[in-house]
Amino acid sequence: MFFTEQHELIRKLARDFAEQEIEPIADEVDKTAEFPKEIVKKMAQNGFFGIKMPKEYGGAGADNRAYVTIMEEISRASGVAGIYLSSPNSLLGTPFLLVGTDEQKEKYLKPMIRGEKTLAFALTEPGAGSDAGAVATTAREEGDYYILNGRKTFITGAPISDNIIVFAKTDMSKGTKGITTFIVDSKQEGVSFGKPEDKMGMIGCPTSDIILENVKVHKSDILGELNKGFITAMKTLSVGRIGVAAQALGIAQAAVDEAVKYAKQRKQFNRPIAKFQAIQFKLANMETKLNAAKLLVYNAAYKMDCGEKADKEASMAKYFAAESAIQIVNDALQIHGGYGYIKDYKIERLYRDVRVIAIYEGTSEVQQMVIASNLLK
């Protein structure tokens, strides 16, 4: 219904890549907190980093359905790999497509799609999480430059970034209408990073604070129009929700796979636990939730590909897929019993990785607000 033969070929390509290149190193990445640069390079070479980016910028020019299929398959092998995949296609690529100049696309977007440049999306602050409009980072005009001061927190990929997309207040009196987007060089004077967070999951893509102290940014590195940064941020996050939702699908599918395999192998009372109705009902509920979530994600991607407004559908997909994935992984761990609590089993990693999906790029509560606001218009 949602996919063409071409989409299915893309899915197979992503699945084969994930099984051959990512699955074998996923547990080691979780232990060492280092994702191999050669795998990142291979993902870029396979066209994954620009799957839905226009061909003129080095992308594949595919659609949102192609993107979610790849996200699903890559995340099935590793949620962390899904982060590396989603960034150029979503949080980091979208702002350039929306408001970037030709020069900015040439300088930042193209190298990012090729896997040669890494960026970070710096919106969240200690006092501005779900209330993104409350950013306190300031940008003061000084001739041909703006001087940035502030602190960003929980920024994915910050310590390994070459450049940072920073949202700062250029007019303190206008609230969300006084926020501007800047492109900042990670290595320039005044930019520093906090200690990488000791995270529960998604280990292998570092997360840290970014400290900006009198950072001098030329006006040519303003991304979009002055005081229009909040609009850019919100549009970017809206587009990105289906990617995160697809990431949830991949992790949930991996959990179902592990639970089915374990239930068939594990014997109690002289027979596989898969023969017990209690386990069968749990597996049935997991599979039903997963397929319901898939339909929501695929429908949102399809509507976006048709050029229809899909804010509500994207939020429904992100909300339901995230919450369902958490429940599915929890049930899969329960099926494993005590072994599910041991790091030698994949389900333990999935349990830690999946939890953040209901938090980042818009919490489940924010998604509910978006859904409700669309209903009550």
Curated annotation (Swiss-Prot):
Signal sequence range: none
Domain of life: Bacteria
PROSITE patterns (alphabetical): ACYL_COA_DH_1 (PS00072), ACYL_COA_DH_2 (PS00073)
Cofactor(s) essential for the protein: FAD
Oxidoreductase recorded as keyword: yes
General function of this protein: Essential for the reductive metabolism of L-phenylalanine, L-tyrosine and L-tryptophan. Catalyzes the reduction of phenylacrylic acid to phenylpropionic acid, 4-hydroxy-phenylacrylic acid to 4-hydroxy-phenylpropionic acid, and indoleacrylic acid to indolepropionic acid.
Protein name, as recorded: 3-(aryl)acrylate reductase
Lineage: Bacteria, Bacillati, Bacillota, Clostridia, Eubacteriales
Gene: acdA
